[in-house]
């Protein structure tokens, strides 16, 4: 889940298969429909994982928790990753970043370019 101005901007859901785990879901190579993503911000030789990603809006209570985490940490732009344990349904926030790693090819995955929103925020802050 990514935030700008401590407010929820967008989320992505990574569809894992088996026992795989990916610490950088922004670099996933395909949408859930199988469409290849433009990955200009990723290393040229990055291996393709075969994992699939889609835009996702979590439940309101998770959005509020993520916004609260970022506000309490004093992080205006960044990301929070979480996972729900299939064994017991518990929610775990496992990665809080003060630097956002926006999803590759935002328009295809989430329907807009998150960098545009980031630039708008930074211009407003600089004014």
Language model regions located:
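Phosphate-binding site of ATP-dependent enzymes
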Residues: 1-73
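A general marker of short, structured functional hotspots
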Residues: 6, 17, 52, 78, ...
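C-terminal active-site "lid" helix and adjoining low-complexity regulatory extension at the edge
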Residues: 56-57, 71-75, 84-127
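Hydrophobic residue at the +6 position relative to the catalytic HRD Asp in the kinase catalytic loop
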Residues: 80-82
